[in-house]
UniProtKB/Swiss-Prot annotation:
<feature type="binding site">
    <location>
        <begin position="129"/>
        <end position="134"/>
    </location>
    <ligand>
        <name>S-adenosyl-L-methionine</name>
    </ligand>
</feature>
<dbReference type="InterPro" id="IPR029028">
    <property type="entry name" value="Alpha/beta_knot_MTases"/>
</dbReference>
<keyword id="KW-0819">tRNA processing</keyword>
<feature type="binding site">
    <location>
        <position position="110"/>
    </location>
    <ligand>
        <name>S-adenosyl-L-methionine</name>
    </ligand>
</feature>
<comment type="function">
    <text>Specifically methylates guanosine-37 in various tRNAs.</text>
</comment>
<dbReference type="InterPro" id="IPR023148">
    <property type="entry name" value="tRNA_m1G_MeTrfase_C_sf"/>
</dbReference>
<dbReference type="GO" id="GO:0002939">
    <property type="term" value="P:tRNA N1-guanine methylation"/>
</dbReference>
<keyword id="KW-0949">S-adenosyl-L-methionine</keyword>
<dbReference type="InterPro" id="IPR029026">
    <property type="entry name" value="tRNA_m1G_MTases_N"/>
</dbReference>
<keyword id="KW-0963">Cytoplasm</keyword>
<keyword id="KW-0808">Transferase</keyword>
<dbReference type="Pfam" id="PF01746">
    <property type="entry name" value="tRNA_m1G_MT"/>
</dbReference>
<dbReference type="GO" id="GO:0052906">
    <property type="term" value="F:tRNA (guanine(37)-N1)-methyltransferase activity"/>
</dbReference>
<dbReference type="InterPro" id="IPR002649">
    <property type="entry name" value="tRNA_m1G_MeTrfase_TrmD"/>
</dbReference>
<dbReference type="InterPro" id="IPR016009">
    <property type="entry name" value="tRNA_MeTrfase_TRMD/TRM10"/>
</dbReference>
<comment type="subunit">
    <text>Homodimer.</text>
</comment>
<comment type="similarity">
    <text>Belongs to the RNA methyltransferase TrmD family.</text>
</comment>
Amino acid sequence: MKIDILTLFPEMFVSPFNESIIKRAREQGIITINITNIRDFAQDRQQQVDDYPYGGGAGMVLKANVLGTAIEEVKGPDTWVLYMSPQGKPLNQDRVWELARRKELLIVCGHYEGIDERVMAMVDEEISIGDYILTGGELPAMVLVDAIARLIPGVLGDENSAMEESFSCSLLEYPQYTRPASYGEQEVPEVLLSGHHENIRRWRKKQSLLRTLLKRPDLLLKKCFDEEEKSLLEEILFHRENKR
């Protein structure tokens, strides 16, 4: 996959994209990430990229002729253009899977008060990472790239890891444990030490359902349950009812 990012602050991406799985994916040629400075497309000596908004108001707006030229220069015929914006559709795991199937992405990082509305005609999709305001689109872009990268074949060491993580099946991930088996007065659940793979699988499924019910019950409203999940959920609800 090829990912291009347009930003006024390219140095912000140096450390995050040169660590951990994204670094390995880039070194192996699985992902190509290009960071382009919007200021390189400024059209005056002062390299001005923003200006005061027509009609007055606070803040500055990224200029259409600068950002528009940058998008035209960087994007290819098959590029899907994304603009990180609090006005966009909320990002979720289903959307991440859809974006991970594309070959080329261009992520536009806004700044200041926003971008000239005329550039929006060049944007295919606006994406938000939450209902809060950040200084610019750089941090949301990093979140998006990290989420997408994990789903690309070859990036994670275990191909099943992405499928088993939280939200992949509209469920939160089951509890994880490692050595030592005893920590203070807390013990690792015996089933995980049993070596019985089927019992372990069923325990993890049940724990995922329980954890989702307790922490994110909204996720269960949109999930299609298989027969095993229905049975496990009934066990959970029966147990909770009897504890009252």
